[in-house]
């Protein structure tokens, strides 16, 4: 087992500073080798703090070159074990070390063998598995811990079903996967006392395969009750009885120690219960700490259970979805004296498809990434009841791409013809079946809106809906109804149907269908089908040629409007003014030609497929998969035609059109989005549903619901605003620098960096800084990292390859740290306690004026800035502010680095939108003392 400490992450730039190797057999350590290494360069201060290795220690150590012979002799040809070992080997490979040694990665092994772990860092695994780990990030201790972890994982592998091990070994044999030998060794150990037959027979005998030789589930299909049958006349809720449960001394205080009675929570519960009883719609703004989830879940559960009704609860974020389904609802189920069922339903691509998994298993010659994902799935499969991707650790884009090959996908689904669905082993349809019998159905906004788009074919019929995080609803509807296309995507759709590779020679789905039909149809019928197929193939080639003309014309037209040398994507609205220019004429002609050819392909496919469906005397079962794919490709091309024809030739009044020139490769994409969302929400949600509750901590702008009401057409909804129970005057200091320039003035960035640095040093890190652009974020990160590093403060930065979840985890668990984020970090961040004591808002979060959707919608107002831009920014500002105080004991500082809150006519509206808190104005130089005094007071 080996571990290195290094001066940085890039082997080409940085060097090893300490190395430790442990030789072991089983649980016995045979020998150790350890040495500090002189990196022959400066060790960054942050790395010194992380590893505990000082510059003086490293300068007095031998060079790695002088240690090579000793290290090579010690390790010999033994297999090497390490946690994320490829990182260590990349440094050692520069010196020709260990090129021929087998390498076993305990990080990869743990992610396969322990699928239900929350995190896979060496220290977290050691803690969860009871392995005594010493000081983190000292190579001596990490190497010993890794050796012990490997033995624990080896023992875990031996406890797997032998058939699972054999299947992983069989699949790995045809790949270059480093862990194949590990599973071969485990199989050999397990098989010593077992008489083995063929792999297929073993899998069949152990229930891993079904009679078709396909992987199947390891659990019996659960017995479920029939779908709910709503009561003819709903029984009203007893509002007073429900409210009493939340009173001091009520059911909640008896069941949950530490429960606090909150009048705001009771008031919200009464409003929600009233909406259920009166079948009215409701807008509820409930400040942080109200406990709004219990305030709506309690009446929802009682109403649904009493009346055998479905109540759908929709959230915007996965975090809230998980909180509701895995914590709040189970708490209610334990507390309440009634039985009610809940289901969590996600988009279908979150569910494993066993038929597609089987197809991937049979492919052969699998890459190491594919093998890694297959091993994870095969180990996880016996324990899952849901087939939900969230239960499998897939950290890389490559692994998530492999999931895309095995997940449930409408383009590959055989529906009722699928054997797995017939046997009750389709995870997606089983999830839908559970939803049909559930009283509470938890979904996200995307699935809620997708159900509307497909005319309610995803969710069971329901009349009661609660939308949490409702401030995101307009954006969610916009995303759901938006369209995007580029040349590559359109060409791939056409190519999947057919592509001419030589005169008279084609490949693609149509060619496969022709070959598949030959033995199934008589000569005459096959000749007719082949002729129809050839007609469609020719239409595809015609569409392909005009596709090139279209995008060449677009490039020529848009080149006159692009700004050269920009490092970001440029979005250009396709307005009437743009279309009136002479250069657009060529685009319109090419667009007309392409969409007409595209319509010809769609019609040709329709006639071909209808003709084959009418051949009732022929058994075309063996062609079902090809026919299904052609149906779906035809449907996608039809949708593309329906969007592109108006975009290019016949624009519609209520649609926004734009083109994006992508900075990375300069390719062009075309986009559409709805101009007015409120009319759609009114038509498809408010009108058909009996009751809808929309709730969030931020629904009001400038003290009024007018903005959100107008955006969502929630004209008839009752409005309830509840303040937070938190004591903001005592817990929150709002500091407004008096000597910082406005954002568009010289020296603003320099002064903002200075203020942020002073605050972080005074607070010892513990700071979340929110930005409105990646450009400012990265400029700030470069400016402050060194200074804060010298103060032993770590800086975590969004957009540098680390996931949002990992950034938050690093921030929570690193005592002296700062997190710089934009976009998604303005909401959904929930860090309680001293880990987050300071919040910095770099700029007021106005939308980018050139954003096509923002610009087009702004034009519908008499005063776009005051009526649209300001209210929208205020809601975002309030969301950001809400990241600081998450509990009654939290205490902290909000620093706003945008002087416009005090100098512009609209600035006071931003301040007035916040809870009443302590405000200090003063020069930046006073900030450190003010911060220390405020934070030292304690809660």
Task: Specify the residue positions occupied by each region the protein language model found.
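Signature of the SF2 helicase/ATPase Hel1-core->accessory helical subdomain module
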Residues: 296, 322, 412-440, 444-596, ...
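Conserved non-catalytic scaffold segment of RNase H-like nuclease domains
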Residues: 1-102, 115-137
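Acidic, Mg2+-coordinating catalytic module of metal-dependent nucleases/exonucleases
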Residues: 79-95, 117, 121-189, 894
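Conserved RecA-like P-loop NTPase helicase motor core
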Residues: 737-747, 799-904
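Acidic two-metal-ion nuclease catalytic site recognized across multiple nuclease folds
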Residues: 151-238, 927
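A contiguous, basic/glycine-rich beta-loop/short-helix subdomain that forms a polymer-engagement track
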Residues: 404-439, 449-456, 598-740, 747-754, ...
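A substrate-engagement module of RecA-like helicase motors
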Residues: 223-232, 239-250, 308-439, 508-534, ...
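Conserved pre-motif I regulatory segment
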Residues: 236-284
């Amino acid at each position: 087992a080996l571990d290195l400490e290094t001066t940085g992450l890039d082997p080409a730039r940085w060097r090893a500073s300490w190395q430790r190797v442990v030789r072991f057999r089983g649980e016995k350590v045979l020998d150790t080798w350890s040495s500090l290494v002189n990196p022959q360069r400066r060790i960054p201060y942050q790395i010194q703090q992380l590893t505990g290795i000082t510059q003086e220690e490293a300068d007095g150590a031998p060079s790695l070159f002088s240690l090579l012979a000793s290290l090579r002799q010690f390790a010999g040809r033994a297999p090497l074990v390490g946690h994320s070992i490829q990182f260590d080997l990349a440094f050692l490979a520069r010196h020709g070390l260990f090129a021929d040694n087998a390498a076993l990665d305990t990080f990869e092994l743990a992610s396969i063998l322990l699928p239900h772990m929350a995190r896979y860092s060496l220290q977290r695994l050691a803690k969860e598995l009871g392995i005594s780990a010493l000081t983190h990030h000292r190579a001596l201790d990490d190497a010993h811990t890794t050796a012990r972890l490997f033995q624990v994982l080896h023992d875990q592998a031996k406890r797997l079903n032998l058939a699972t091990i054999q299947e992983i070994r069989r699949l790995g044999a045809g790949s270059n996967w480093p862990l194949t030998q590990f599973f071969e060794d485990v199989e050999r150990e397990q098989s010593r006392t077992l008489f083995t037959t063929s792999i297929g027979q073993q899998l069949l005998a152990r229930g891993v395969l079904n009679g078709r030789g396909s992987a199947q589930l390891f659990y019996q299909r659960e017995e479920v009750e029939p779908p709910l049958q709503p009561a003819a006349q709903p029984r009203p809720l007893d509002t007073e009885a429900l409210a009493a449960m939340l009173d001091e001394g009520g059911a909640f205080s008896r069941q949950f120690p530490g429960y606090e009675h909150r009048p705001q929570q009771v008031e919200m519960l009464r409003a929600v219960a009233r909406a259920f009883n009166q079948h009215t719609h409701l807008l509820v703004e409930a400040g942080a700490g109200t406990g709004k989830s219990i305030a709506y879940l309690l009446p929802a559960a009682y109403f649904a259970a009493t009346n055998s009704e479905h109540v759908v609860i929709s959230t915007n974020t996965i975090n809230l979805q998980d909180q509701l389904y895995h914590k709040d609802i189970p708490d209610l189920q334990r507390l309440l004296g009634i039985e009610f069922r809940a289901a969590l339903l996600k988009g279908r691509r979150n569910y494993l498809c066993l038929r597609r998994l089987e197809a991937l298993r049979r492919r052969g010659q699998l890459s190491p990434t594919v093998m890694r994902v297959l091993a994870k799935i095969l180990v996880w499969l016996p324990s899952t009841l849901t087939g939900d991707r969230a239960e499998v650790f897939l950290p890389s884009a490559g692994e998530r791409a492999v999931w895309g090959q095995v997940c449930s996908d409408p383009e590959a689904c055989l529906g009722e013809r699928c054997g797995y669905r017939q046997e009750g082993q389709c995870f997606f349809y089983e999830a839908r079946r559970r939803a049909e019998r559930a009283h509470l159905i938890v979904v996200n906004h995307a699935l809620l809106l997708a159900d509307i788009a497909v005319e309610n074919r995803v969710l069971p019929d329901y009349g009661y809906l609660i939308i949490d995080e409702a401030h995101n609803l307009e954006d969610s509807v916009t995303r759901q109804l938006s369209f995007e296309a580029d040349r590559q995507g359109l060409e791939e759709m056409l190519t999947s149907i057919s592509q001419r590779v030589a005169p008279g020679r084609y490949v693609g789905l149509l060619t496969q269908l022709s070959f598949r039909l030959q033995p199934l149809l008589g000569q005459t019928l096959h000749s007719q089908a082949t002729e129809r197929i050839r007609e469609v193939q020719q239409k595809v080639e015609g569409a392909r040629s005009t596709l090139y003309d279209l995008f060449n014309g677009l490039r020529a037209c848009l080149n006159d409007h692009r700004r050269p040398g920009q490092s970001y994507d440029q979005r250009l609205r396709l307005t009437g003014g743009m279309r009136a220019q002479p250069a657009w004429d060529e685009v319109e002609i090419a667009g007309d030609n392409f969409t007409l050819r595209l319509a010809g392909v769609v019609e040709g496919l329709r006639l071909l497929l209808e003709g084959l469906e009418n051949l009732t005397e022929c058994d075309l079962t063996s062609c079902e998969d090809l026919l299904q794919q052609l149906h779906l490709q035809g449907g996608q091309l039809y949708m593309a035609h329906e969007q592109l024809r108006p975009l290019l030739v016949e624009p519609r009044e209520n649609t926004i059109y734009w083109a994006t020139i992508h900075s990375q490769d300069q390719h062009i994409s075309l986009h559409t989005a709805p101009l007015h969302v409120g009319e759609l929400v009114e038509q498809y949600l408010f009108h058909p549903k009996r009751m809808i509750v929309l709730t969030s901590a931020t629904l009001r702008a400038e003290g009024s619901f007018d903005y959100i009401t107008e955006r969502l057409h929630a004209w008839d909804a009752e409005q309830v605003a509840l303040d937070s129970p938190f004591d903001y005057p005592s817990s929150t200091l709002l500091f407004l620098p008096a000597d910082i320039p406005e954002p568009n003035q010289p020296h603003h960035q320099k002064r903002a960096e200075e203020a942020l640095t002073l605050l972080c040093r005074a607070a010892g890190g513990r700071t979340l800084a929110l930005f409105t652009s990646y450009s400012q974020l990265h400029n700030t990160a470069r400016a402050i990292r060194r200074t804060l590093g010298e103060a032993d403060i770590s800086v975590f930065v969004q957009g540098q390859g680390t996931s949002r979840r990992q950034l938050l985890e690093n921030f929570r668990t690193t005592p002296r740290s700062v997190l710089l984020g934009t976009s998604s970090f303005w909401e959904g961040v929930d860090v309680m306690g001293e880990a987050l004591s300071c919040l910095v808002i770099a700029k007021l979060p106005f939308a980018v004026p050139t954003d096509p959707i923002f610009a087009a919608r702004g034009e519908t107002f008499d005063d776009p800035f005051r009526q649209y831009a300001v209210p929208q920014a205020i809601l975002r500002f309030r969301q950001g502010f809400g990241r600081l105080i998450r509990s009654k004991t939290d205490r902290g500082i909000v620093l706003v680095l945008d002087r416009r809150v005090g100098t512009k006519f609209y600035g006071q509206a931003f301040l007035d939108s916040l809870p009443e808190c302590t405000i200090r104005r003063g020069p930046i130089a006073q900030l450190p003392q003010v911060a220390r005094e405020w934070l030292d007071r304690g809660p």
